Amino acid sequence: MNPRPKLRSPPPSSVVISPGSPPKSLINKMPRKFTRSTLTLATTLFSILALYAFLNTFIFSDPPNNVSSVSFSRNYNTQNLKSVKVYMYDLPRKFTYGVIESYALARGGEKQSDDSLLKYPGNQHSAEWYLFSDLNRPSLERVGSAVTRVMNPEEADLFYVPFFSSLSLVANPIRSNNAVVAPVERPAYSDEETQESLIEWLEQQEYWKRNNGWDHVFICQDPNALYKVVDKVKNGVLLVSDFGRLARNQASLVKDVILPYSHRINTYTGDIGVENRNSLLFFMGNRYRKEGGKIRDLLFQLLEKEEDVIIKHGAQSRESRREARKGMHTSKFCLHPAGDTPSACRLFDAIVSLCVPVIISDHIELPFEDIVDYRKIAIFVDSNTAVKPGFLVKKLRKVSMERVLEYQRELKKVKHYYEYEDPNGTVKEIWRQVSLKLPLVRLMINRDKRLVKREFTEPDCSCLCSNQTGILTTL
């Protein structure tokens, strides 16, 4: 905050007007008629200012203190700014409900004659289903959203491609090395073929060709989703969990949107407090991961003998989720180390559990950072420091109970941003983030039409950072 400006005395030549009446010297030097007009004007201006002050104080005053200024500002902007028009492609069935059906059939399910009977399986990458469902809702149920669905593509600012890319990736069950597999020539479902088929379909669409895909939005929340064709859709706005598997010329914070995982732990419904949180630190997950996730094994070695720390190896299962829910709801801090990629569902499980996240992931990107200050809800520790013997638990034990409560208060304020089923939660915020990309999309469309493409020997970020392309002559 800037210091209050010092009061300055008027210069010697100034006329000081005392309250009550105009100075005599000024009256003597002016015609009486002019002086009366001046006083009338001054009275009118004073009345206008007084009315403005009244309205500003009592009618247009700031929201009450118990209303979050961030939420107020966000809701005000959402309701008052012109919404972005989005056209959702009516994709062939195999890219939407067909993926759900293939997933179910591969697990012993039966074909359904009615798509409404198909149920999208709950998983950490289910954002694709929530966004698809949201755009299919009646417009009256989407009041306040930053985007409006239009049925005429000519009216659209952006085009949403609702391919269930993350579910497609796992439509065929992953079998262990010891599993006995029936001798078949090929799987019934091929994610790679489905990806390529999507591109073939898109390349036939007028609106895809019109702007080279810049105004298209794709969801690929699983780090490996769309891996086969990502170079063909990289111009578009990508909705991703992180950039762990994407090259620098494929994705960036400038162009794309970071999504939260759909949490798998039930939301903590109690109030803030530490009375029932007897454990210092909790973690449950796969101990052995690749790449940046190798730090997990080191953390296991350091922490598994600490008496007030619960750290367990566990795979995905209902029983594991029940155990994780109990652990997160009864611990003060929840560990979030990197996995195969920088992000993981565990962070969002911790947030809705009001368990203060301890993030040890050097390259993590976080969703909604324009409205959420993660320093207020989480503790960050770099990997090299975290693996120093005794450092982590010593640091956490020094955190006062009042400080833990402060973290919990902030977590409670923002946790709705990570609830996909909340009408004012994740889905609404994702669309707001997408709408903010529109000015850049328009810039890139216009820029793209005047430039000559050049071939580079290695990936670059010229599309985002600088003009490393040639100029197209327009004369």
Task: Label each residue range with its predicted role.
Residues 2-287, 291-318, 324, 329, ...:
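Juxtamembrane luminal stem/stalk of type II transmembrane Golgi/ER carbohydrate-processing enzymes
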Residues 323-418:
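Catalytic binding pocket for nucleotide-activated donors in carbohydrate/polymer assembly enzymes
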